[in-house]
Amino acid sequence: AASDVYKRQKDGRDLDWETELSSANPTEPVPVDSWDPLYILYTSGTTGLPKGVVRDNGGHAVAMRYSMKTIYNAKPGDVYWAASDVGWVVGHSYIVYAPLLHGCTTVVYEGKPVKTPDPGAFWRMIEEHQINHFFTAPTAFRAVRKEDPDAEFLKKYDISSLKGLFLAGERLDPPTYDWLQNIL
């Protein structure tokens, strides 16, 4: 329960966001050059040792903005959700940077597509946050399909805000594709 979180807080280590925010001073943005590093993210190491990949500010920002408009057809003001691991380059880019650069609201979610508490977690999030664009991996929907093959949990939620579903990161198997086509 939420009250349990407060019981586990430790003085001197854990800070209350609202308290800290109320005493914070505004800070001006720091200008950077387009070629300055934005972040370093390490690859998985599937082809050997993990390698640090450095993204620059300008090029990455342009690519993210372009993809939001031309690939995802997102409009400023839309709600975009990438249900991915923020440590993966796609999750990092489409949770943190792309939606905000394009003027969208981004949804940050901690949990699995099933058993949090049930296979309706994705549908519940779409309804609650009026999500317009949803991006995840096929594995997530394979898990949902396994737990809820008849999409009974979907029927509990209004997902009419959803304009697009995008899947990437691995092969989308035909049974999962067909299941999604049939329920959506």
Q: Which residue ranges define each predicted feature?
A:
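Positively charged, low-complexity/disordered segments
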Residues: 1-4, 61
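Conserved pre-ATP/AMP-binding loop-to-beta segment of ANL
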Residues: 11-15, 21-42, 49, 59-64, ...
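Conserved S/T- and glycine-rich ATP-binding loop of Class I adenylate-forming
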Residues: 37, 43-46, 68, 80, ...
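Residue(s) in the substrate-gating loop at a strand-loop-helix junction
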Residues: 85
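Conserved short alpha-helical elements in the N-terminal third of ANL/AMP-binding
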Residues: 91-107
